Amino acid sequence: MAGPTREFWQQRFVANETPWDRGAASPQFATWLASGALAPCRILVPGCGGGHEVVALARAGFAVTALDYVPAAIALTRERLIEANTRATLVQADALEWQAAAPFDAIYEQTCLCALHPDHWRAYVDRLDAWLAPGGRLYALWMQVIRAGAAEGLVEGPPYHCDMNAMRALFPSSRWEWPPPPYTRVPHPRGWEELAVVLAHRSPAVAST
């Protein structure tokens, strides 16, 4: 399997070597919430990591399901939920294999896609397509981290650079409704940026027309 393994991520969380972790939910979460773009519903957080967004969503009244295949990440998210005196459904499973019992109204995608080697992006987007109900919203924060090796064709990460041309190919307009650019740039403490985009999931009938 290309890219980092479960053991790689487990060691990172156990050693607290998680430089991508802001220490809090992304400021974009508060922006979406305050504007009404994101409102309480059944929401999935794949690749939940340390669970900052999981806690923030649960506190805001969402019915949250948090998904991660790393035991230490699930344990940390559980600890933070207990500390915050709030609740969410925690699922330890591989995002490329897990099947939901019912579709979700929304998905909060921030740290899963950029943690996966690009070889697995298509399979992951297929899972997003299956998890999200028609008309549901994908709240995406796509990592922008162009590395020097890219000029020589190297694929470097994690986190992997989420090129917007690649995102348009992965999320075609036949299945996903895109808002017009420009998109909000969200600074990261590590000096990276994320692009905030909300996609609407088209119904099969609309997608086939």
Located regions from the model:
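Conserved acidic residues
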Residues: 105
